[in-house]
Structures are given as C-alpha cells and as structure tokens.
C-alpha cells in the first residue's frame, strides 16, 4: 500500500478537464435560464441543480484527494451515514425497529470503515453480508412485534448493503497493492469515479420516455451513455494499470453496473412512491447522486483485486 498521497500530475489533469466540463455545463444552464426568462422550464432548473451538486462533489473530492487516504475514508463514512439516513427515512419502521437501526448506524458503519482503515480485508468482506445479515433479524426479533417482520427486516438489510457495504468499496481501493503500477491508487479511484459519474451525465442528457418503471430513463439512453462511458474509459487508460483494451472492458463493466444500479434504485423509489431520496443537493439527495456508484464500486474493486494485485 502506498502512503504518498500527494496530488499527482495525472489527477490534476483529470480534475482540470472536469472543471472545464462543469464550467461549460454551468454556462449552458445559465444561458437557457436567461433565454427562458421568468418562465424557466423544470428541465433547466433540474439541470442547474445537478450541475451545482456536481460542483460540490468535485470540490469535495479534490480536497479529500489532497488530504489523502484518511480524508477519503472520512468522506465515505459521511456519505454512508447520509445515504443510510435517507434510505431508512423512507422505509416502513416503528418503535420495534429502533434498536436494529441504531446498530446499523453506530456499530456496523464504524466497524466496516475500521476494517477499511486497517486493511482487514477478510472482515471487511464478510461483516455485513454474513454477520450483519444474520444478526439484524435476531436483534429485530428480540424486540417483539412480528407484524411485517420479513418486510421490515429485508428493507433494513438492503439499505445496509447498499449504503454501507457497497459504498465502502470506494475508499478500500486505496489499500490495494497493484502490480507494476507507478501511480498512487487514488488515480485509479478517480478513473472509476469519472467513468461511472460520466455515465450518469450521458444517460441524463440522452434520456427518453417509454419505460414503465421510470419514464425519464430507458434503454435508448443506455445505448448512448454506456458506449460513451466506455470510450471515455479507453481514453483514460494512461492513468490506469490497464491496456487500452482492458480499460475499455473495465469501463464497459462499471458503466453497465452503474446504469442498472441507477435503474434499480429508481424502481425502489417508484415502489415507495417517492421521486428523490432527499434534498441534500437542492432537488436531489446524496443517494440519488451515488446510486450508480453503489453498484459499480464493489465489482470494480474485486476485479482489480483479483486480476491486478
């Protein structure tokens, strides 16, 4: 594991490109806002809100990249706490669930990131899928009130898996010993973030109607967003340990996982009768912005760990 978490030149180049893209996106949003005058469409308002959230996320990432591994872990501890809170606030629960929920926030979350911090991969991998999966129903059952037991327990388990377990795979990338890779692992982490989040942007820009689950996003948007994200990953191969072909395959894999992860989370929101998980970013929540990453990060981590370490 490398400890030299300065800001490499490659990271600076990528961030410069991100800031340029965000500046163009901001100018485009302001242009259409002024063009429409007082009757600004919801699409323009949503676009400007999304761009503002991307600015916040990008600046937070830049600061944590400067701080290093500790800053990145702290950032995702906060992200897991925020996303779990957003998720739990929308699933059915009553007083009998309080102890189980407290266990998730104040025991499982700190433990999971402690294992990330200490590079305890075996416990990091099994704490939530094995021990928490078995323990949470036991704690819930001890509280009594068997009404909708399976439904309520499954929702809490799902929330813990997505918001704690899956998100914790982002900072744990920094702990890998990658063969023949001269750059700090933080560069590889940036590669994953850029490709996955760009897929979200491309899908949003090219979304079409017609899906029964979520009208704004359909397979036609996947036909555009996934190839563009894969092309971007191929162009960024030089900051990774991958060859251009490997970067393309990896980009395709995480783009697919990110797209369908977003689809799954949108389907869950529809089933709960909500449009967004919250309003941390004006019109969207933290989980709304990170849902694709929740699905892409674990797959990316394990592929890199098994084939490049």
Residue ranges of predicted features:
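Juxtamembrane helix-loop transition sites at the ends of transmembrane segments
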Residues: 71, 107-110, 283, 294, ...
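Gly/Ser/Thr-rich helix-start
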Residues: 222, 252, 262, 284-286
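Transmembrane alpha-helical segments of integral membrane proteins
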Residues: 261-276
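Interfacial loop-to-transmembrane junctions
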Residues: 272-293
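Juxtamembrane boundary at the C-terminal end of a transmembrane helix
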Residues: 302-309
């Amino acid at each position: 594991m490398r400890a030299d978490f300065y800001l490499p030149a490659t990271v600076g180049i990528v961030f410069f490109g991100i800031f340029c893209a965000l500046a163009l996106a901001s100018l485009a949003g302001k242009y259409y806002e002024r063009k429409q005058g007082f009757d600004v469409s919801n699409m323009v308002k949503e676009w400007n809100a999304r761009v503002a959230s991307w600015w916040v996320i990008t600046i937070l990432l830049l600061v944590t990249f400067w701080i290093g591994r500790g800053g990145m872990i702290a950032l995702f501890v906060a992200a897991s706490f925020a996303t779990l809170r957003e998720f739990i606030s929308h699933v059915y629960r009553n007083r009998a669930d309080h102890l189980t929920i407290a266990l998730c926030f104040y025991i499982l979350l700190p433990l999971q990131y402690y294992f990330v911090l200490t590079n305890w991969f075996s416990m990091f991998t099994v704490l939530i899928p094995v021990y928490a999966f078995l323990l949470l129903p036991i704690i819930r059952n001890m509280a009594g009130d068997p009404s909708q037991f399976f439904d309520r327990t499954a929702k809490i388990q799902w929330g813990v898996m997505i918001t704690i377990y899956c998100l914790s795979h982002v900072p744990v990338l920094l702990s890998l010993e990658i063969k023949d890779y001269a750059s700090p692992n933080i560069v590889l982490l940036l590669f994953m973030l850029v490709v996955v989040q760009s897929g979200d942007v491309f899908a949003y820009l090219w979304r079409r109607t017609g899906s029964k689950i979520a009208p704004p996003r359909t397979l036609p948007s996947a036909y555009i967003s996934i190839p563009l994200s894969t092309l971007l990953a191929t162009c960024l191969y030089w900051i990774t340990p991958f060859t251009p072909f490997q970067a393309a395959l990896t980009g395709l894999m995480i783009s697919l996982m990110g797209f369908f992860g977003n689809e799954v989370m949108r389907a869950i929101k529809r089933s709960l009768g909500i449009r967004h998980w919250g309003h941390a970013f004006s019109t969207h929540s933290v989980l709304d912005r990170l849902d694709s990453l929740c699905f892409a990060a674990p797959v990316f981590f394990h592929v890199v760990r098994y084939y490049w370490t």
